[in-house]
Amino acid sequence: FFENQQLQQGQNVPVIANELHGVHLEIHVPALAQLIEALNTGEADPMQVLPVLQAMYQHISDTAQLAAGDPALEAEVAQTKQVLQFAEEAINNTMKAVQKLQRDQAEMEGGEEGVAMAEQDAKMQEHEIKMQIAQEKAELDMAIKQKKHEQEMAIRDAKAALEFRENS
């Protein structure tokens, strides 16, 4: 609950390895979905929501990465990945809306130079955000694959030990 308040203010909140990640996902994912819905219906201001979206995306992605190691949370992680895809789309769309607002504002302030600088800054910011999202996605996928591999190895080892015991 406290973390959601911090995330709603656009603050980055680190994920601690020994937390109950399933509970965190149950709390954070609906809040993110609600934020996306508010953005889609026009209830939320894109300029104000963008940092919140980014902070929530980062935190939930990190939490899902750690939760991926728990077989009991497999369904929760799959649902979270789906919501993260919606969040990624919302971030990209919001970035475009913010860029348009910045272009319009630069035009109102006057001058081609101001428009060009605003466009360049916005494109750079958009590129950085897309790179960050791509990196987080890759890290999440890699963590899930690693955890599954570790589980498969543990199951194989347990079966081999059982067979060895039965044959001895």
Residue ranges and their predicted role:
Residues 1-168:
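C-terminal anchoring/interaction modules
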